[in-house]
């Protein structure tokens, strides 16, 4: 099949997971469209080159703030259309939970979109302090999470400062503290209750919903809260009903089921006399990381408009059936707002090609296991391929055991491997996925016979969910996509940890154990993009092997082009050492003592001292200059 732009899109499933923000251009480069297909197209290799010319180094995080605004606009437009279709007059507010990515360049950009259609959510005291500064006057702030008196006091101060803060009661003990602090400050609090739904959305994050959820009130506890408030000056303060169906909900039916249950809570609270003006449905809107449009954990089987409709319709029907005032619908879809806006770019530093295998010459003292392997290779065209592979596996294992017992030497051990790889490649050429009986062996061979692409980044720092929960992220070369990839490889990071390997890849609308990649060219960079990393990854990343934050740039649309709006240097080695308790002055003193004790010339001492200082203040990652 002739390689083409369409085939590049299909191979990496780009058109499905990209959601209109990324594609391949005629030059074989990945391009980003920050404001959608009708806007400017920006070449990712061109941006990386411009950032490097300005001093940035790889690995490099590219942020596209215009995507944040565009995603928010699409979310608001979807709910506007759904409310129009269902004749729902309650309105809609998209709340951003800043735990998804607290960076000022993310939360601040979203917060700059003024109006009733946007709000912020905090789940801790530091996050609350941030949103109190970011929110517009009169802006909606949802206060979730565990709370002590200081947290509650700060939220109430927000009310006195003209912000619409709502303290969501998630534990029965919180209500008493809220009422006491409100009385002390002389302010009427904005109150909400988080109800714990029995409905459970399937997926990796299902424990955030359902009866076993960490947060939320049981039906009895909800009634107890209302019993305390009813008939007091605070009764009219209970305005928010909040719930959470789960995060990254893959199946739209789970959303529909959760909304049916939640709507009953809204109706019952309203009939009891609570003035519920806002229904906060929490998160749940998923991202199709896989591009498979399915119910698997890292995909979704619905679109944005379907999501909005499944939220609006039950509330619209309930308000009509029970003659209730439609509440304002609030969502906390942080993942959907932010995932697309960030791309990590890293360079391949080296490739370890899978051995092709060979048939060694016959020697007089050849062990029986080597002779058997040689005979198997000679029968590749005469016997069933699968049968030969299983025999080769048997004798290969027998040879390894013999070597461990000292019965064969290293030379013959290497010959066994050579023959096994030669047989494996020969068997794979004779198998086809069209034959159902071939698939198990073919899958095993495809997983075994792959190159290792060593990439200048840390899985644990930049895409920690790959290690923690087997999260899928699309990975695509950002250039040479006008050439057919001729190798299959796995991506390995820089860390001294076998978990620093990506094990699943998006390919041809499914998942595979390896990724189609190109052969490296001497003296030419080969750069790979890790896409949809804008949600959670920066915040969850750790410092395994003391690899810290990468360099980052913000790339803003400027007319029909772009500009690098902001550049942030990543962590240097001295910053990482200081973070884990090293006294840098002492480190430098020890270096100086050892140089003096070595008895070198002044010139050599100066040169070594300069190199040590450069290492101490340098970027922890490898050089991004391609090897000659």
UniProtKB/Swiss-Prot annotation:
First and last residue of the signal peptide: none
Name of a matching Pfam family: Arg_decarb_HB
Keyword Lyase: yes
InterPro entries, sorted: Ala_racemase/Decarboxylase_C, Arg_decarb_HB, Arg_decarbox_C, Arg_decrbxlase, De-COase2_CS, De-COase2_N, Orn/DAP/Arg_de-COase, PLP-binding_barrel
GO BP field: arginine catabolic process; putrescine biosynthetic process from arginine; spermidine biosynthetic process
Entry keywords, A to Z: Decarboxylase, Lyase, Magnesium, Metal-binding, Polyamine biosynthesis, Pyridoxal phosphate, Spermidine biosynthesis
Record-given protein name: Biosynthetic arginine decarboxylase
